[in-house]
């Protein structure tokens, strides 16, 4: 029996051994089939995603156009409502305020109307005023304005007004276009219309509102290509300058009333703004004609106006008057002897 059991065990083992490598042929060739079969669904999914993105973009554009049309319809409806007020039917003294909310599409239109009528019993004069404020909100009835001032948007964003809405926009990096300092990220300033890291407040090209905002040697003036005034260096010899129709008045206004931006800056110290070649263009020229060396010494560097600040205001006015008188005398000398004699008579007086 033991021998028979051993024979049966050997037979079973011999039958089981060849069955082990049997699955190997299926493993070697089966991966070749699913490859192309798996690629088609992936390509189809990619195309579906592209079509879905295009559809979403078209829907978003249609939604924006629909919202714009609804806002225009709301404004027209508010205008019609205000025009329906009959002044004659109102009592002599009338005051009324109404606030209404109307659903227009997916938006809520808020209309606040104030009507006031006052009649003077003695003169019979009637004063009528009407104020209509219209705003459009979203589906939840909230106002579309996201912010009012820059501080409402946080440190890395600023408040921008566009398309009749105030929204928070991300700050702009270095060398990007700007119109305000708050549009630039971090400690950057808007200089010459671009966000700049190295700019200092009141420095060359920084935004200004009046002359006090600029550092010495600079003046607040408008520049071509910019919609706002910037701190500009005082022009030197040969550069365009502020029209000196009344040089003394300009000097006093700039020294005593440093408010408001100019179209062009006045000349640096030692220079006069004079017409160039009998034209309407004014350029900075030396104050003492024929003394070129003296004018070069008296020219004020753009960034170092220390000598200009040390001179007192009275002395500066006196110097401007003397320079103006000398310049007029030399210009009149070319016209004939009569003007020279009359000018000499004035000097003797």
UniProtKB/Swiss-Prot annotation:
Coiled-coil parts of chain: 39-84
Q: What GO CC annotations are associated with the protein?
A: extracellular region; extracellular space
Glycosylated residue positions: 96, 106, 121, 204
| Primary localization class, coarse | secreted
Role of this protein:
Antagonizes canonical Wnt signaling by inhibiting LRP5/6 interaction with Wnt and by forming a ternary complex with the transmembrane protein KREMEN that promotes internalization of LRP5/6. DKKs play an important role in vertebrate development, where they locally inhibit Wnt regulated processes such as antero-posterior axial patterning, limb development, somitogenesis and eye formation. In the adult, Dkks are implicated in bone formation and bone disease, cancer and Alzheimer disease.
Domain topic, free-text comment? The C-terminal cysteine-rich domain mediates interaction with LRP5 and LRP6.
> Which Gene Ontology BP terms does the record give?
adrenal gland development; negative regulation of aldosterone biosynthetic process; negative regulation of canonical Wnt signaling pathway; negative regulation of cortisol biosynthetic process; negative regulation of DNA-templated transcription; Wnt signaling pathway
Task: Give the UniProt family note.
Answer: Belongs to the dickkopf family.
Gene name per UniProt: Dkk3
Region forming the signal peptide: 1-22
- The protein, known as: Dickkopf-related protein 3
Q: What organism does the UniProt record list as the source?
A: Mus musculus (Mouse)
InterPro entries per UniProt: Dickkopf_N, DKK1-4, Dkk3_Cys2, Dkk3_N
Q: Where are the annotated segments for DKK-type Cys-1?
A: 147-195
């Amino acid at each position: 029996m033991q021998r028979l059991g051993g024979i049966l065990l050997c037979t079973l083992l011999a039958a089981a051994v060849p069955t082990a490598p049997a699955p190997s042929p299926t493993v070697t060739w089966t991966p070749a089939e699913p490859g192309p079969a798996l690629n088609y669904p992936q390509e189809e999914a990619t195309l579906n995603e592209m079509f879905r993105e295009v559809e979403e973009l078209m829907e978003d554009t249609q939604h924006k156009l629909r919202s714009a049309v609804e806002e225009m319809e709301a404004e027209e409806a508010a205008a019609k409502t205000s025009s329906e007020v009959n002044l004659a039917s109102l009592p002599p003294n009338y005051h009324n305020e109404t606030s209404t909310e109307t659903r227009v599409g997916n938006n809520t239109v808020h209309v606040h109307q104030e009507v006031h009528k006052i009649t003077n019993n003695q003169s019979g004069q009637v004063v009528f005023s009407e104020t209509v404020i219209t705003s459009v909100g979203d589906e939840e009835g909230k106002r579309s304005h996201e912010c009012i001032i820059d501080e409402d948007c946080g440190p890395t964003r600023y408040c921008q007004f566009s398309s009749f809405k105030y929204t928070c926009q991300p700050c702009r990096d270095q060398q990007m276009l700007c119109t305000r300092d708050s549009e630039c990220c971090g400690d950057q300033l808007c200089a010459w219309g671009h966000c700049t890291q190295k700019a200092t407040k009141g420095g060359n090209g920084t935004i200004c509102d009046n002359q006090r905002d600029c550092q010495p040697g600079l003046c607040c003036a408008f520049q071509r290509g910019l919609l706002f005034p910037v701190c500009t260096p005082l022009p030197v010899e040969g550069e365009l300058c502020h029209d000196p129709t009344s040089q003394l008045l300009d000097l006093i206004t700039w020294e005593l009333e440093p408010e408001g931006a100019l179209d062009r800056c006045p000349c640096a110290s030692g220079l006069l703004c004079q017409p160039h070649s009998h034209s309407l263009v004014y350029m900075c020229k030396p104050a003492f004609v024929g003394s070129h060396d003296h004018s070069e010494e008296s020219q004020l560097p753009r960034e170092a106006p220390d000598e200009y600040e040390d001179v007192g205001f009275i002395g500066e006015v006196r110097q401007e008057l003397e320079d103006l008188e000398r310049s007029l005398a030399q210009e009149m000398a070319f016209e004939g002897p009569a003007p020279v004699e009359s000018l000499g008579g004035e000097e003797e007086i």
